[in-house]
Each structure stands twice: as C-alpha cells, then as structure tokens.
Amino acid sequence: LGLPVLCTSFAEAKAALGYSDDFANYDLCEVMYTHFQLFGCQPVILCNMLNPATMKATVTAADINLTDHKALLPIDAINDASLVVKPSTSGSALTKGTDYEAYYSGENLVVEAIEGGSAYSAAKLNIAYNKVDTSKVTKTVVAGGFAAVDSCMSTVGIVPDLLLAPKYSSESEVAAVMATKAGGINGMFGAKALVDLDTATANSYTAAVSTKADKG
C-alpha cells in the first residue's frame, strides 16, 4: 500500500494489484487496461492507495442461491475473517476448508461448497461479508500517494516522466500536488503532470481553458 510497483505487462499488473473491469471504482485497473491493452505501452509504475483492511463496509447476511455448488459474490467482497457462511439464518457458521472454499474468479468472489462437507447438497447459503468501499479513497488520500514518487528511483530503479491520477486529478488539491511533484523529483529530475478536466463543465475548448485557469 502506497509503494511504487513497476509493471511491464498487463498480466504482471493484474498479478501484482488485482483487476476488475469496474473502472468507475477501480481507477488503477483503467490505467492498466489503457496502458497495456489499448496502447501497448510499457512500463508503468502503479501506486495503490486502496486499503481493504480499513476502507470497507459491512454487507448484511443474505441467502444466496448456489449453482453447481457455487455462490457468486461481487468482486468487491473481501475474503477474510468477516466472511461468514451458514446453511441458514439461524444455523451455525460453516467451516472454511472443510465445508466450503472461497476464491476470486473473474469478477466474483466464489464461495464453493466442498464435496463431503455439510453444505454440499445445499441449494442456498446464508452469507455475510465485508466489501471494499472505494468511496473512502478520497482526494486527500490520493494526493498523499504522490509522496511515493521520490522513492521510485530507489525502489524500482526508474524515475517517472508522466504523473497521472485518473478522475482525482480534476480536483484542484490533487492537481496542485501533482504539479509540485512534477517540478522536482529527488531534487534533480522533472516530469509532466497529466491533469484531468471535468467534462461536465469543460465541455468545449473555451470552457476547457477557463476550467484549467480556475483549477490553477
């Protein structure tokens, strides 16, 4: 968390940080896809500021139907001690590794009943869990992440020449930190800050210029 991660391929980036097509909530995944899949560029240095240990929300227990002995939870479900699986609302919690396994596959956290376990013949399971709350990644958190720029040389051996913070850089506070950091990395290198403009207001060339001026 908050450390530079050097990636030279789409597969490497996914293995290092995980991946989802939900770009509205997972901005680094959008960078991965755009950088490697759309434009075929490499490398890229990614810095994750989403901490699922603290940036989470509770999902109330609910019955979920099983298909092929599997219950599919959304990708933002967290596979940790908060995952409680029961045969019913009033039943006792099942044992992970004996009655079920939980693992990520595609865009889901899969809860699969184990053959020989007490839930293998169940048609549904009652499941409670915590989920990632991406709304807790605030502009302040993202701005703070740019402190990692100065450690890129010592940790990954490369100094970035372009700084990005998709969506967040449209906030003046984040853009200001990016501009300052781009002006002097490790006291000797320079970079360019690629800052987003909110197209809700910057919807023409003229508006883009005025919005840029307003944001500083």
PLM features per residue range, with description:
Residues 1-216:
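Surface-exposed assembly/interface segments
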